[in-house]
């Protein structure tokens, strides 16, 4: 194996792993050669009210697009997360809640979660929620959010979770697009020691948008703030409604292809895009990927640091883990509050075995230095995961060495809101690891690299990442706009699902995600992935974070414009700029030499931590009057600072 450092599967990991290398190869072969047999068998991993007899019925034919899995089966997602476990593990912890305040935590058993879910399902029915209705959930990371999602699933309502950091405008757009008449929120959320005015934002959203026809707003008391505005007749207190609700509620029988939830992806421009996931295939896929990718064994304590407002929170805090009877940790706070040792403290406090987090969080801790883990042992950890964007090798190595004590394999998972679950990732007992590579496809997933004309490229190469055939967790449509679904994902390369990402494949068949295709630079006719240049910059010991975009260049077509955030204590200078240019030349080659370096106090990020390169491209091109939708920015002030300090006016 090449491509720099390789971490072979250790004997200890291999011994306890669910799948070894030869098993992975055989299972993968069957999954693509005979998907009906493979998924027919693995579809039985969840409980069916009426078993399916049909497995896969899908075609990527552009004129006849159809994606259906287990289509004659009947099931209920909440029953698969709760009821099926009551006999064997009713008294086992289902959710460990860790509050924003480190002194606040509690364990919720499967039986308690079942009873709360049934009660709230009855509350929703009493308020007029019916099967097929869209319920908007705008909540903090608390147990009641999990209850709300599961209660919707129990009665066949479609939940639409909107991240609690989104603005009233963004919330309003999602309520209107989903034709949602019911909103569940909290008086306030707590995050990093600050109160987030959720109820106030809901009120603003409903005033802001004339088309928002909301009948009921159910409000959970999180902070007990009695100053929140109240609209009699519309607003209802969660606690009052739950007092007399019955703890028995029969799960609604759902066809496998009935919708389970929708989740809006920001899309760089245009109307919100409501990604719709259905019940059967999604549950099979979320549960199976959770078990195999994280090598989950009974009793493991599993912590995914995502938010319910993102697909990672849906698939890998809630549905996947609970379907598997797992112990899942629900974290209200942020990794650096009250200080940067919090992540290590939570791991030690709850004896976390599996940690799944984002490169953004890892790089933020890296910038603080290794001392951020002082006073914590993290000795319980046996597996680490990464999600959200490609992880640069330097962050991978730091994560492995500092957080994982050099003993935990890292599963670098590549997937999307649209895919429902992980598509490319190592299985820890089967695949040797290369820092920065998502490695190999999961069962049933057939990735390919194509050129701009759609020709499939073989062997060691680089191109546009497509998937050649359907898998059970795949989205079925964009809510209310099937034509946009077909156009967005299936029109670029006919007969293939286009991911929008670029990738390279090395001589071992490993996939390396190079970033969104619009994040590929064409410098003097050479293709350069921005992730590659960013990786090189972040490898420099004075650089905390870097973002790379193209800008119009008279000679090269595109020049390389770099935004650099320095490590605490380092000072910007012209000498350091020259040093960084030489560093990149050394790491990648002269073709990758940055043309412009701008010092950045921070980078514009969405609330899920993704860098908004679209905005950085506009600033670099001096088009800051055309920034487009900035409602998803975590800190809009960063943009103003970058515009005022732009490297050339």
Swiss-Prot record:
It catalyses: acetate + ATP + CoA = acetyl-CoA + AMP + diphosphate. GO terms for molecular function: acetate-CoA ligase activity; AMP binding; ATP binding; metal ion binding. Acetylated. Deacetylation by the SIR2-homolog deacetylase activates the enzyme. It holds the Pfam family ACAS_N. CoA binds at residues 191-194, 312, 336, 524, 585. The keyword Ligase applies. Signal peptide: none annotated. It comes from the Bacteria. ATP binds at residues 388-390, 412-417, 501, 516, 527. Mg(2+) binds at residues 538, 540, 543. Disulfide bonds: none annotated. Its EC number is 6.2.1.1. The modification N6-acetyllysine is found at residue 610. The keyword Metal-binding applies. InterPro entries: Ac_CoA_lig, ACAS_N, AMP-bd_C, AMP-bd_C_sf, AMP-binding_CS, AMP-dep_synth/lig_dom, ANL_N_sf. GO terms for biological process: acetyl-CoA biosynthetic process from acetate. Its cofactor is Mg(2+). NCBIfam families: Ac_CoA_lig_AcsA (TIGR02188), PRK00174.1 (NF001208). Belongs to the ATP-dependent AMP-binding enzyme family. Catalyzes the conversion of acetate into acetyl-CoA (AcCoA), an essential intermediate at the junction of anabolic and catabolic pathways. AcsA undergoes a two-step reaction. In the first half reaction, AcsA combines acetate with ATP to form acetyl-adenylate (AcAMP) intermediate. In the second half reaction, it can then transfer the acetyl group from AcAMP to the sulfhydryl group of CoA, forming the product AcCoA. This is Acetyl-coenzyme A synthetase. It comes from Marinobacter nauticus (strain ATCC 700491 / DSM 11845 / VT8) (Marinobacter aquaeolei).
